[in-house]
């Protein structure tokens, strides 16, 4: 199943507690909490390019499944990590954050840091 496509965020759960847990300042959280993001995923075999647009901020990450890559995080840090594909789930671990992007109807992303779980749901456009 291909992840390729454009997705519009439709809902999110536990945004503020999760963003505080990863260290985003309160003023930044307040500025972005009502913004809905758009994600574009381009998949060519095991090669991916993910472009996330939230308000004026655009983040682009490219990676190959199973190979170490450096990616930009929501906090602005660059982190080395490895992405894995497990059926319809794209998994990555970033500094203690476990992220699972599950391709379902709709598309669901769940991120966990300790016992704080952030869930965002997007719809394919």
UniProtKB/Swiss-Prot annotation:
It is found in: Cytoplasm. Keywords: Cytoplasm, Lipid-binding, Transport. GO terms for molecular function: lipid binding. Pfam families: Lipocalin_7 (PF14651). Coiled coil: none annotated. The keyword Cytoplasm applies. The keyword Cytoplasm applies. InterPro entries: Calycin, Fatty_acid-bd, ILBP. GO terms for cellular component: cytoplasm. Its main location: cytoplasm. Belongs to the calycin superfamily. Fatty-acid binding protein (FABP) family. This is Fatty acid-binding protein, liver-type. It comes from Takifugu rubripes. The gene is fabp1.
């Amino acid at each position: 199943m291909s992840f390729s496509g454009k997705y519009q965020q439709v809902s999110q759960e536990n945004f503020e507690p999760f963003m505080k847990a990863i260290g985003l300042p309160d003023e930044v959280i307040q500025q972005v909490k009502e913004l809905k993001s758009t994600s574009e995923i381009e998949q060519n075999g095991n090669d991916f390019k993910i472009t996330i647009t939230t308000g004026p901020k655009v983040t682009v990450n490219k990676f190959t499944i199973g190979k170490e890559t450096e990616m930009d995080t929501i906090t602005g840090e660059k982190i080395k990590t490895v992405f894995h594909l497990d059926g319809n789930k794209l998994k990555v671990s970033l500094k203690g954050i476990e992220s699972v992007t599950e391709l379902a109807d709709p598309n669901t992303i769940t991120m966990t840091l300790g016992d704080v779980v952030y869930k965002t749901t997007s719809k394919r456009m």
